[in-house]
């Protein structure tokens, strides 16, 4: 069954809270909820989880059984019929059915509760359930499947056992079998139906998604066994085969979609989304946090995998699989001090060299498994999409936010270490520095680039993993403490903040009377700015932040970093740290970058340049290009998101420092407060960041987070309005889009982090640029694809262009000898590995500065002839073009004749490049008979400058045939 994204996301009933939120979720990067049709087919996403593609019959029995109990359940079941495949036996319910069933009557649920629980366990209909009961059902389901996809930490309860209710929570009847989730079950619905979530629920991270069964309390009476059997039989006909690993990105996107996780995507409810507890967090934001979370990264990578099977899917490590049961709780050290600053409007000084924060970000962690290893990360994301000014002793909005630089996730240097060690000490991120220097060469390690006069929200992420390389597959638990929100400034604006810093920070020498006039100077500046009163009242700040959490049911209230502010007093001039940038911006850059990769090569080139400034490698530059492209979209997204965020932001306080438990659900599951989304975003950000520093640096503890992937709910922590993304952003789901996202050029910072994570996961597609730098042969189809060199020529196809970074014109432009491409010919064997060829081959045409495109399998857009063309020069181009489309030939000719010269700077340069390419091609040809195809590719690559690595055999073969023509001309 192929679902249209619209069908999946928009088919929900109008009265469904998800439906209402759907409009707001339009910005979801992976799944556009927009009304406009998208060519993106969810089938790719569903394929992983939908082993059963065909049967609408599986749920018919369920429908009947439920129909007896509840009319609504019947309706839900009916919807499910469409989505459920016979194999899955109802394991996959259409998302709309889940949502529509969110309103199922409790009576029907109660009647069928035991049967539903059992059935749900067997059929995994409770994919979207966020209540503890539902979660337990999901756990049961996963047990039945034998593989637990959910990232939740709670041990699965025995199948058929009614989900235990959380202590202190009124028992919630399990949702109907078919209505995979009751209103409280759906993450979105959870937000929509606060009545189901007692305020106490969100305080413990375990509540909702990850809460271990609290006990039988409130369990609905089991339904008559015969009824149960019927439902189970109907739903369980064939036990659904364990669903393939779901693309993390796809899962995140779907899970974060307003409709809620799509049951089809999450077989057996293996992925449980922590329930949002609106009661606990009146200000909780709906799905789609402003931040890109680690989960976003995982999801994005998963989506990419779906699009590009060659890439290893990022799989969330199932916490249940490792047998570790933990219920992490995080508290912010120095909370009182943070609150003092927050009341006045915390300001953090950012400097070119980087300034530590004060109060410091310090946390205490409890509830960890003593033996299991954990990785702790911190990132700083834009709290909203506004620029502020301090006027009349108060902070006020001064306009839309500036584009955010790629944000990075700062990995605690002690990571990974055992829970026992983490719990014995205060976890301090005092070494993290805030800077406004976009060219900071060391920023990817310990600094985060922020924009002055912008508001940022630090986020604390806890991941159970024994290796940083496993981050992409791990469950991120994100904790956000609203009181740690701050505005980045180059000089303190509010005198009260200055005084607070002086009073509490022993290192705030610059502002003391003995500060050699530094304080006076700053005060003068502040006075000029009219700093007299609180720069921001917390409410305003929170409202500003709302967009960040908008994507989520709410800002993860449970995320309350209690950093010991006093410890980092030395960083009196704490700088604002925007890891993610406006939640929308980072997200946007990711998805948007993909789009722009397709649509805006020039922007991508700029972004690439930007990334290079950031110190990223060529791959980083590509990511940067995406980021740059994203930046523009980012602003619009920010504005849109901000409006939404402001609405949601008000109540989204990280009042529940412990409430992260919900986030514990899993990388794919949004944290109960939506932290998972943030977590995903963080992961995505981390991946992007990793890519930004240079694809190869992923393992570094600091995950440099560029704008994280735009996790829809989870994937788009940065929540850029979908409108900002061209439809191509959906392309993330598309193979080309995914490839683009994976391709360095296509990667935005968020993707970069994902890419970095993927790199750690050995996803060449994500880290194709990294591989190119490393000289590894790109394995993923994306790598096989040529990344466009940001050539002036538009790429032939949006999809192709994203991955075929090199358009016929673009390749031709560099055809002389791409800095690495020409090398491809010389590289010979190296050429086979596009990246290697780049590194090994001489770069006869340094004149063409476009970053070497990461070898992507030759995109259809870039004909092999292009590769030949550079070699042949004008004539060679003609020969090579023989097999290319007229437009391609023309572009090639232009490239060879004039464009090539332009890139090289002169005809002579072009000629020299061609000569080098020819020599390299000849050398390659002679040296690598066994790689003839590759040789041809290398020749072509020389001409294309970045076609060098084209692992795809068929492409190679094609190139080879062309090579015959090309080599003839070239060698001659």
Curated annotation (Swiss-Prot):
Basic residues composition bias: residue spans: 274-286, 952-963
Annotated region of DNA binding: 332-513
Cellular compartments annotated: Nucleus
Residues with the Phosphoserine modification: 887
SMART domains listed in its UniProt record: TBOX
Region spans: Disordered: 44-248, 263-286, 508-563, 645-676, 805-889, 918-972
Start-end of Pro residues biased regions: 155-176, 213-225
One of the protein's GO biological processes: imaginal disc-derived wing morphogenesis
Compositionally biased spans, kind Gly residues: 818-831
InterPro entries: Optomoror-blind_N, p53-like_TF_DNA-bd_sf, T-box_DNA-bd, T-box_sf, TF_T-box, TF_T-box_CS
Pfam families for the chain: Optomotor-blind, T-box
Tissue spec: In third-instar larvae, expressed in the brain region that will develop into optic lobes and more weakly in the thoracic part of the ventral ganglion.
Domain of life: Eukaryota
GO cellular component entries: chromatin; nucleus
Function: Essential protein that may function as a transcription regulator. Vital for pupal development. Required for proper development of the optic lobes and wings, and abdominal pigmentation.
Protein name, as recorded: Optomotor-blind protein
Protein species of origin: Drosophila melanogaster (Fruit fly)
Classification lineage: Eukaryota, Metazoa, Ecdysozoa, Arthropoda, Hexapoda
């Amino acid at each position: 069954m192929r679902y249209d994204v619209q069908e999946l996301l928009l088919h929900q009933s109008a009265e469904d809270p998800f439906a209402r939120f759907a409009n707001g979720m339009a910005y979801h990067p992976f799944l556009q909820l927009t009304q406009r049709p998208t060519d993106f087919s969810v089938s790719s996403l569903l394929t992983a989880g939908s082993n059963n593609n065909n049967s609408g019959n599986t749920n018919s029995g369920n429908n009947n059984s439920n129909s007896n109990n509840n009319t609504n359940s019947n309706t839900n079941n009916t919807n499910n019929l469409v989505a459920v495949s016979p194999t899955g036996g109802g394991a996959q319910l259409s998302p709309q059915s889940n949502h529509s069933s969110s309103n199922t009557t409790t009576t029907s649920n109660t009647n069928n509760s035991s049967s539903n629980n059992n059935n749900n366990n067997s059929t995994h209909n409770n994919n979207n359930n966020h209540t503890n009961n539902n979660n337990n059902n999901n756990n049961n389901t996963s047990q039945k499947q034998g593989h637990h996809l959910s990232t939740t930490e709670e041990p699965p309860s025995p199948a058929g056992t009614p989900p235990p209710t959380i202590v202190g929570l009124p028992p919630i009847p399990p949702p109907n079998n078919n209505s995979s989730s009751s209103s409280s079950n759906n993450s979105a619905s959870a937000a929509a139906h606060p009545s189901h979530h007692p305020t106490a629920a969100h305080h413990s991270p375990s509540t909702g998604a990850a809460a271990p069964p609290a006990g039988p309390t409130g369990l609905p009476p089991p339904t008559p066994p015969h009824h149960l059997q019927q439902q189970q039989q109907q739903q369980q006909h064939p036990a659904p085969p364990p669903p393939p690993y779901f693309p993390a990105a796809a899962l995140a996107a779907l899970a974060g979609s307003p409709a809620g996780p799509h049951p089809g995507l999450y077989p057996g409810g293996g992925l449980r989304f922590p329930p949002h507890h609106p009661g606990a967090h009146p200000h909780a934001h709906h799905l789609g946090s402003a931040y890109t979370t680690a989960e976003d990264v995982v999801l994005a990578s998963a989506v990419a995998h779906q699009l590009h099977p060659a890439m290893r899917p990022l799989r969330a490590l199932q916490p249940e699989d490792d047998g570790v049961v933990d219920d992490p709780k995080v508290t912010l050290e120095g909370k009182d001090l943070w609150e003092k600053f927050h009341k006045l409007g915390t300001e953090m000084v950012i400097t070119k060299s980087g300034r530590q924060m004060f109060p410091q970000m310090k946390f205490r962690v409890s509830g960890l498994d003593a033996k299991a290893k954990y990785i702790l990360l911190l990132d700083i994301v834009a709290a909203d999409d506004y620029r502020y000014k301090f006027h009349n002793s108060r902070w006020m909005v001064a306009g839309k936010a500036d584009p955010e630089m790629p944000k990075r996730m700062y990995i605690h240097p002690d990571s990974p270490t055992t829970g026992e060690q983490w719990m014995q000490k205060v976890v301090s991120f005092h070494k993290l520095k805030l800077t406004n220097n976009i060219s900071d060469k060391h920023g990817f390690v310990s600094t985060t680039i922020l924009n002055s006069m912008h508001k940022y929200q630090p986020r604390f992420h806890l991941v159970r993993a024994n290796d940083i390389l496993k981050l992409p597959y791990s469950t991120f638990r994100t904790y956000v403490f609203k009181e740690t929100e701050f505005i980045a400034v180059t000089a303190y604006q509010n005198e009260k903040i200055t005084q607070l810093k002086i009073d509490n920070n022993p290192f705030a020498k610059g502002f003391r009377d003995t500060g050699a006039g530094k304080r006076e100077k700053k005060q003068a500046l502040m006075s000029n700015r009219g700093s007299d009163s609180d720069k921001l009242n917390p409410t305003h700040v929170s409202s500003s932040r709302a967009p960040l959490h908008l994507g989520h049911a709410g800002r993860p209230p449970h995320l309350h970093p209690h950093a010991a502010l006093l410890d980092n007093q030395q960083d009196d001039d704490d700088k604002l740290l925007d890891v993610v940038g406006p939640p929308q911006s980072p997200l946007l850059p990711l998805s948007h970058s993909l789009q722009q990769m397709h649509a805006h090569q020039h922007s991508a080139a700029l972004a690439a340049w930007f990334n290079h400034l950031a110190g990223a490698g060529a791959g980083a530059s590509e990511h940067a290009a995406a980021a740059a492209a994203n930046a523009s979209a980012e602003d619009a997204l920010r504005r849109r998101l901000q409006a939404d965020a402001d609405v949601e932001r008000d109540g989204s306080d990280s009042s529940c420092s412990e409430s992260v438990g919900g986030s514990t659900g899993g990388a794919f599951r949004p944290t109960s407060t939506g932290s998972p989304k943030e977590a995903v975003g963080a992961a995505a950000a981390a991946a992007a960041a990793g890519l930004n520093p240079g694809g190869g640096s992923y393992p570094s503890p600091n995950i440099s987070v560029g704008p994280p992937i735009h996790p829809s709910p989870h994937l788009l922590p940065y929540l850029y309005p979908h409108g900002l993304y061209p439809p191509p952003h959906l392309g993330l789901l598309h193979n080309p889009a995914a490839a683009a996202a994976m391709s360095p050029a296509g990667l935005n910072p968020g993707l970069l982090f994902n890419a970095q994570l993927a790199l750690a996961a050995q996803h060449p597609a994500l880290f194709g640029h990294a591989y190119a730098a490393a000289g590894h042969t790109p394995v993923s189809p994306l790598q096989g694809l040529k990344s466009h060199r940001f050539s002036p020529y538009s790429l032939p196809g949006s999809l192709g262009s994203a991955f075929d970074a090199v358009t016929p014109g673009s390749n031709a432009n560099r055809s002389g000898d791409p800095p690495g491409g020409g090398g491809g010919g010389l590289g010979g064997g190296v050429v086979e590995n596009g990246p290697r060829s780049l590194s090994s081959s001489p770069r006869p045409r340094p004149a063409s500065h476009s970053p070497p495109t990461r070898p992507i399998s030759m995109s259809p857009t870039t004909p092999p002839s292009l590769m030949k063309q550079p070699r042949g020069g004008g004539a060679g181009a003609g020969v090579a073009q023989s097999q290319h489309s007229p437009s391609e030939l023309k572009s090639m000719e232009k490239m060879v004749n004039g464009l090539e010269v332009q890139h090289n700077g002169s005809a002579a340069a072009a000629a020299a490049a061609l000569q080098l390419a020819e020599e390299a091609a000849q050398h390659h040809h002679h040296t690598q008979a066994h790689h003839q195809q590759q040789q041809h590719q290398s020749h072509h690559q020389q001409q294309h400058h970045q076609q060098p690595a084209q692992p795809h055999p068929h492409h190679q073969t094609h190139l080879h045939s062309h090579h015959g023509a090309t080599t003839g001309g070239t060698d001659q």
